[in-house]
Amino acid sequence: MIDFTKKKRIVIKLGTSTLTHKTGKLNIRRMTNLVQVLSDLHNAGKEILLVSSGAIGMGVGKLNLPERPKDTPSKQAAAAVGQCELMHIYDDMFSKYSITVAQILLTKTIVQNPERRQHVQNTIERLLQLGVIPILNENDTVSYTHLTLPTTSRV
């Protein structure tokens, strides 16, 4: 077990399988527990950065699709719907603990460009100073390359 007591900043990665059931529907119990633990760490003075996958999986559930899409336009459509749903849920759950969250969607182009990357880093630093939990994800709606690869954890 990691001792978080000596850490000031904690980065947590949550994947689709952590956030959703195989049906694509939200795993409410698990997400509620995670938000409670992260809120407690935040209230103890820790800076929390949340890297969250799950947009496509949430979109599959929200759209009641029978399975995860295989074609890129359908994956992107599911991601567009799912990202809204995912952030709505995070905002709702964290607000119960009076914690504000922010969405930061990244692409390979942003991360590889030094000036754009610096803007993102500056934004994250300012959000943390304001007591906000930044929630980062790759922008699956426009990141074509990412959708054709098996992993979703590049952010």
Task: Please report, for each region that a protein language model flagged, where it lies by residue.
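N-terminal glycine-/serine-/threonine-rich phosphate-binding loop
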Residues: M1-L49
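Short beta-strand segments at enzyme active-site cores
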Residues: V11-K13, E47-G59, A102-Q103, I135-N137
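Short, active-site-adjacent cap segments at secondary-structure transitions
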Residues: T18-T20, A55-G59, V111-Q112, T141-S143
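Short acidic, glycine/serine/threonine-rich loops at helix termini
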Residues: K22-G24, G59-N64, P114-Q118, L147
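Glycine-rich loop at the start of a catalytic domain that most often binds anionic cofactors/ligands
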Residues: A55-T72
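Ligand-binding beta-strand-loop-alpha-helix segment within the catalytic cores
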Residues: R68-T141
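Conserved small/polar residues in nucleotide/adenosyl-binding loops
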Residues: T145-T151
